[in-house]
Regions:
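Periplasmic N-terminal accessory/gating domains of Gram-negative outer-membrane beta-barrel systems
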Residues: 80, 139, 165, 172-180, ...
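Short, acidic, small-residue-rich periplasmic hinge/interaction motif at the N-terminus
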Residues: 83, 90-108, 112-122, 127-130, ...
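Short, acidic Ser/Thr/Gly-rich low-complexity loop/linker segments typical of extracellular
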Residues: 134-145
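Face-selective signature of the C-terminal outer-membrane beta-barrel domain
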Residues: 394-413, 435-590, 604-606, 658, ...
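Surface-exposed extracellular loop regions of Gram-negative outer-membrane beta-barrel proteins
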Residues: 413, 420, 424, 468, ...
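Outer membrane beta-barrel strand-and-loop segments of large Gram-negative receptors
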Residues: 493, 502-506, 549-562, 641, ...
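Gram-negative outer-membrane beta-barrel transporters
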Residues: 568-571, 671-673, 695-777
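C-terminal beta-signal and adjacent terminal beta-strands/loops
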Residues: 675-676, 763, 771-794, 809-815, ...
Length: 877
């Protein structure tokens, strides 16, 4: 009996051991590739010596699995878990498969809110919020708002904005949070070692590049403040012109040119409203007072779908709303200009205002300086002044609803005078020539923004922006010749006026999801053009003649709709896909409708490296014509018509970024194709022509390609950057240059910019900026003849052979400044001394035929400004 009981116990123990008793420690190899589930089950049964039962309803159709030298039981568990199953032992070596129980989904809690600067209450645009727990990054939008996911457990958060102290916070991921986070201004001294080390550890992850796309740059007010001061003040457009891919005009030339594009291909926005001419002093200064600038964005590769109507760049400048807590102001007086600004609350925490004004007195100073500096190729009678004013009112109805009202005006006048006297045995001749240009911008805008829920921003925008231009040319000659019965006293005067005006009403929606951001919008624009009112008044041989020839004003409409999807994949790849559809109605009942697709990809390579790729297609429905031959430049804005098609641009951009603790490096390339470009026909000038502008222009194609490099030092006493651009830009017009390709005006092969600032301590700071650019191309005449018309017998008509067949000499200039700042109890004051064009290099602004001492005409380059010392004093209270 005892023996029978012992045998029974052994049998029971064997049955309990059961499963896998034949191969308890056997390692198996198995490779299943797209096989049926039953075949996979048979393979495991054969390998493990077991029987597997399951319901067909839980079995997938096809499966794949691979293991090498894996214990049999572990291999089965891995296989079943991969397809959401597990098993249960029923008896012996028999198991039954079943589905894994569904895990309870954890609630997805979010953090949202606004980030602002503590001293003023200004909402911060582009502030970065990083969550160390889930490695997610978010950036504040134009209203300073952000939203991001929280992980379960503790979330360590960092709020960072350049020039402000970073803030760290810890939140539990057990609920939703809505915050208003204040960041404190960092003093002008070098950051403490502790702060630098914290931010250094973060930057090694490379996440501070996560919000950028190919060909984009962001300038905060702190970064602009660290750039060299130009004639006593910092300048946002000057800072942008030192970036790669941006070519500044020689001594001005009315602005900056991006990736081989024309001036009108830059969409310059002030708080989202277009500015048609954003420059003072023919491009030396921007028309934006640096005191009002909060930050600025430059886009030259991928354009978000909400932007359209331009081909080369988007320059979006955000102005300050005004201090929410107390009245503050600043005033500055210098040798060249003075400015004043005032800001503060009208209703505390509800309504704020900001006003500023600036005026130069270059018209009094320049001639005095020029007369004391030897400038052989410059005119001694330059005249110039500029003025600008800003006003902004912001009212917050609640934490969700905000209204902003803005006004802006700028005015410029510049030109030159020349008087020559020639004496010979034949007699005496006196000539007087004067050219002046006057232009200005005026805008009004209203923006209403509303936060719906915690993840949807709605913006309603309305504005009117207007630009006017006037060009005057006067010529007078007195001849007192021996043998003639009477003295000759003739006069001729030309005048051209033109302008453009935009009115827009638009609605924009921005929605934030877990890994996705969606943007939608639509708008209607009314474009009004005054192509040109031309006037000729002459007094020849005591006979007065007056002629007017004008083009009729035109009004066109443009409707646009856009949508954009931004997706973040696994924290390493960001994809932007957008589409914009623009419909343009011309005055001659022609309709143009074009889709404008765009795509951008940004992916992380290693720890600190990012690769960017983007492709875009854009259309532009109006054009800016310039007479860059000889003489002062003049503007003419014209619309697309039935015979003049919109300009089309297709661009491919690619780039590589490397970001380290104190340094960053970038290398980018681009390929760009144009169609339907416009230029004046050879020998044609709209100013002195009595025909419609459409009859004197030619249409053609173009292309640009180039490489851009930038190295930047971002922290420490010494800060700055070096940029280099290699650029090639060509044009092909059937009716120009015999149909052969020719370089564009903006084909400047090599462009170098070095910008640096050194802070000796909290008080003293030294800045320097040096820029070099290859000479611009221009069309040089091979001959000339005098107008045969009796009303205008002194007008010289030039004969051209080729297009842009001559190069100006290279442009280079060094600007330096040193500043001293002292903070007192109730105010701070700053002295700035600087030198513009420190080594007095005479950069050509334009070329002009002038009479020499022998009475012969010769080609001379005209320089706008020689070496210019500057001393300014400013206070902030």
């Amino acid at each position: 009996l005892k023996r029978k009981c012992f045998i029974l116990v052994l049998i029971l123990l064997g049955s309990l051991k059961g499963l896998f008793s034949q191969t308890p420690n056997t390692k198996i190899n198995l490779e299943l590739k797209n096989v049926t589930f039953q075949k996979a089950v048979n393979s495991f049964e054969n390998k493990l010596g077991i029987s597997i039962n399951y319901a067909t309803s839980i079995a997938p159709r096809k499966v794949s699995f691979r293991c090498y030298r894996t214990r049999g039981k572990k291999a089965l568990i891995l296989f079943l878990n991969e397809y959401g199953m597990t098993y249960k032992v029923v008896e012996g070596n028999t198991i039954v498969l079943k589905l894994l129980p569904k895990k309870r989904k954890q609630p997805n809690h979010k953090l949202s809110g606004k980030i602002y600067e503590s001293a003023s209450g200004e909402e911060l645009i582009g502030c970065r919020i990083y969550n160390y727990a889930n490695r997610k990054t978010s950036f504040t939008n134009e209203q300073g708002y952000f939203i991001m996911d929280l992980s379960t457990g503790n979330n360590i958060l960092e709020y960072f904005y350049p020039g402000l102290e970073p803030v760290f916070d810890t939140l539990k991921g057990d609920r939703n949070y809505r915050i208003n986070q204040a960041l404190v201004l960092v003093e002008d001294s070098v950051k403490t070692v502790k702060t630098v080390q914290i931010r250094s550890n973060y930057r090694l992850s490379g996440n501070d590049l996560a919000g950028t796309v190919a060909g984009s740059h962001k300038l905060t007010s702190d970064k602009i403040k660290w750039t060299p001061q130009l004639l006593g003040e910092t300048d946002v457009m000057r800072s942008l012109s030192s970036l790669p891919g941006v070519v500044a005009g020689s001594e001005g030339m009315l602005g900056i040119y991006v990736r081989g594009g024309n001036l009108d291909e830059n969409l310059v926005l002030l708080d989202g409203v277009p500015i048609f001419n954003a420059y003072h002093l023919y491009g030396i200064f921007s028309s934006f007072n640096s005191d009002i600038v909060k930050n600025a964005d430059l886009l030259k590769g991928y354009f978000p779908a909400k932007y359209g109507g331009r081909l080369s760049s988007i320059i979006n400048i955000h102005s300050k709303d005004g201090n929410s807590y107390k009245l503050k102001g600043s005033a500055s007086i210098g040798l060249l200009s003075s400015k004043v600004s005032l800001e503060g609350p009208l209703v505390k925490d509800k309504t704020t205002f900001y006003v500023s004004m600036r005026r130069s007195y270059l018209d009094f100073l320049t001639q005095q300086v020029a007369n004391r500096v030897s400038v052989k190729d410059s005119l001694n009678n330059n005249l110039y002044y500029y003025f600008d004013a800003n006003a902004k009112l912001t009212h917050r109805f609640s934490k969700r609803l905000k209204l902003g009202l803005s006004f802006y005006n700028s005015q410029d006048k510049g030109g030159y005078k020349q008087n020559t006297t020639t004496e010979s045995i034949k007699g005496k001749i006196k000539e007087s020539k004067e050219e002046t240009s006057t232009w200005g911008n005026t805008l009004f805008s209203a923006n209403l923004t509303y936060l719906h829920g915690n993840n949807t921003y709605i913006k309603l925008k309305a504005f009117q922006t207007k630009y006017n231009f006037r060009f005057d040319q006067k010529y007078a000659i007195e001849k007192d010749l021996i043998g003639t019965p009477s003295k000759i006293d003739d006069q001729v005067q030309y005048r051209l006026t033109n302008g453009v005006q935009d009115r827009e009403l638009s609605l924009h929606l921005e929605k934030y999801l877990k890994w996705t951001t969606l943007n939608f919008g639509a708008g209607l624009i009314n474009h009004k053009f005054t192509p040109g009112d031309r006037f000729l008044l002459s007094n020849i041989n005591q006979s007065e003649s007056k002629i007017e020839f004008n083009d009729n004003p035109s009004s066109t409409f443009e409707a646009y709709q856009y949508g954009e999807w931004t997706q973040n994949f696994s924290r390493r790849t960001i994809l932007n896909i957008g589409i914009r559809n623009s419909i343009h109605f011309t005055t001659d009942k022609q309709l143009y409708a074009f889709p404008e697709p765009r795509i951008a990809l940004k992916t992380k390579l290693g720890k600190n490296n990012w690769f960017n790729l983007s492709a875009t297609q854009n259309y532009q429905f109006f054009h800016l014509l310039n007479n860059f031959t000889v003489g002062l430049p003049s503007d003419l804005w014209v619309p697309s018509t039935e015979s003049i098609k919109p300009v089309k641009s297709s661009q491919l951009s690619f780039g590589f970024n490397k970001n380290l603790n104190m340094y960053s490096f970038s290398l980018e390339g681009f390929l760009k194709e144009y169609d339907n470009l416009l230029e004046y026909k050879e020998t044609e000038s709209y100013i002195t022509n009595n025909t419609n502008w459409e009859n004197i222009i030619a249409s053609g194609k173009g292309n640009s390609h180039g490489l851009e490099f930038m190295a930047e030092k971002k922290k420490g006493r010494l800060r700055g950057w070096l940029s280099y651009t290699w650029l090639k830009s060509n044009r092909v017009f059937k009716d120009l240059n015999g149909g052969k390709a020719f370089p564009s005006r903006y084909d400047r092969r090599h462009n170098i910019s070095i910008t640096s600032t050194y802070a000796f301590n909290k008080k003293w700071r030294f800045s320097a900026a040096w820029a070099y650019a290859s000479g611009f191309a221009f069309t040089l005449p091979i001959g000339k003849y005098v107008s045969p018309t009796p009303q205008d017998p002194y007008r010289e008509i030039f004969i051209y052979e080729g297009r842009n067949n001559e190069r100006a000499r290279a442009n280079h200039r060094l600007d330096i400044s040193i500043s001293h700042k002292r903070v007192l109890k109730r105010y701070s004051r700053t002295w700035v001394f600087g030198l513009f064009n420190a080594y007095n290099h005479h950069n050509p602004f334009f070329y002009q035929f002038l009479y020499n001492k022998d009475g012969q005409q010769e080609l001379n380059s005209v320089s706008l400004l020689p070496i210019m010392p500057n001393l300014s004093y400013s206070i902030q209270f």
